[in-house]
């Protein structure tokens, strides 16, 4: 009886110590203020592709992404900073196995590299996003499945590709579009101001932001669009030319096709 009591006390002490470590990690980074859904334009990102591999969606030929794809759903602070790697939670792909078709289509890796994990190793693109950002999304999310499922649903509900297409902004290696017009199209569709990130004059990412209850809100980085720190006054949505040289036009899908 005494030995059993000692064992129970030992287990309790170990559990308490582990819980204390987790609490301390969470306390070191305060709770986030809002979410940023970051979307990548493959025509810009894939232009830097020099090597192909099976996991790189830029190398899928006619099956390569033809619309904005998900980079991540990021907990952010109102001061422009963000938490990261809030607690240790090793990524387990089997937890999201039922979401794999949607993830491969809408949240693919656009690189052959293996991103670093919060634990010092290398892993998958999805694993990186969960460990760096998903672990900081508490108290909204506590598990991988709901984090990835909600991100997919937000992406499908806020179809930026279709919004731009309807406004006349289509993929082109020759056309330049007014940054203000692109921002206005998104404002009219979702009643918020996005953040736009460019590589030189090409749109690289567009970010749509949400309160913790997933109601849309302005992004912090959108508050000074007139400075155009990242993007010039006129921007492009480049087409992607695969490595084999065969031009592949990134066609804008309709809302029905995106679903």
Curated annotation (Swiss-Prot):
The protein, known as: Ribonuclease 2
Family: Belongs to the RNase T2 family.
Root EC class: lyase
Keyword entries, A-Z: Disulfide bond, Endonuclease, Hydrolase, Lyase, Nuclease, Signal, Stress response
Up-regulation conditions: By phosphate starvation.
Gene Ontology CC terms, in alphabetical order: endoplasmic reticulum; ER body; plant-type vacuole; vacuole
A GO biological process held by the record: rRNA catabolic process
Protein encoded by which gene: RNS2
Active site (UniProt): 71, 129, 133
Matches recorded under InterPro entries: Ribonuclease_T2_eukaryotic (IPR033697), RNase_T2-like (IPR001568), RNase_T2-like_sf (IPR036430), RNase_T2_His_AS_1 (IPR018188), RNase_T2_His_AS_2 (IPR033130)
Signal sequence, start to end: 1-19
Family annotation (PANTHER family): RIBONUCLEASE T2
UniProt organism field: Arabidopsis thaliana (Mouse-ear cress)
Catalytic reactions of this protein: a ribonucleotidyl-ribonucleotide-RNA + H2O = a 3'-end 3'-phospho-ribonucleotide-RNA + a 5'-end dephospho-ribonucleoside-RNA + H(+)
CDD domains per UniProt: RNase_T2_euk
GO molecular function: ribonuclease T2 activity; RNA binding; RNA endonuclease activity
Pfam families given in the database record: Ribonuclease_T2
Membrane-spanning parts: none
Organ and tissue specificity: Most highly expressed in flowers, but also expressed in roots, stems, and leaves.
EC identifiers of the protein: 4.6.1.19
Annotated residues for binding of RNA: 40, 71, 125, 128-129, 132-133
Disulfide bridge partners, by residue number: 46-58, 86-136, 198-231, 209-219
Function: May remobilize phosphate, particularly when cells senesce or when phosphate becomes limiting.
């Amino acid at each position: 009886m005494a030995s059993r009591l000692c064992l129970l006390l030992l287990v309790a002490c170990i559990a308490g110590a582990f819980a204390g470590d987790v609490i301390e990690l969470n306390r070191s980074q305060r709770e986030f203020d809002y979410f940023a859904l970051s979307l990548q334009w493959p025509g810009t990102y894939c232009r830097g592709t020099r090597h192909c591999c099976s996991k790189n969606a830029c190398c899928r030929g006619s099956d390569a992404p033809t619309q904005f794809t998900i980079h991540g759903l990021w907990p952010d602070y109102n001061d422009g900073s963000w938490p990261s790697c809030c607690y240790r939670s090793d990524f387990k792909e089997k937890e999201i196995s039922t979401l794999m078709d949607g993830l491969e289509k809408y949240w693919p890796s656009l690189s052959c590299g293996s991103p670093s994990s919060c634990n010092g190793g290398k892993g998958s693109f999805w694993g990186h996003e969960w460990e760096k950002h998903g672990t900081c999304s508490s108290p909204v999310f506590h598990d991988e499945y709901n984090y990835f499922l909600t991100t997919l649903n937000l992406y499908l509900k806020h179809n930026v590709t279709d919004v731009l297409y309807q406004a006349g902004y289509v993929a082109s290696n020759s056309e330049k579009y007014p940054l203000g017009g692109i921002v206005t199209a998104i404002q009219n569709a979702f009643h918020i101001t996005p953040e736009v990130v460019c590589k030189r004059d090409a749109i690289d990412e567009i970010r749509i932001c949400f309160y913790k209850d997933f109601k849309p809100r302005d992004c912090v980085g959108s508050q000074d669009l007139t400075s155009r720190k990242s993007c010039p006054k006129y921007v492009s949505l480049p087409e992607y030319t695969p490595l084999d040289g065969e031009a592949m036009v990134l066609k804008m899908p309709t809302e029905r096709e995106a679903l």
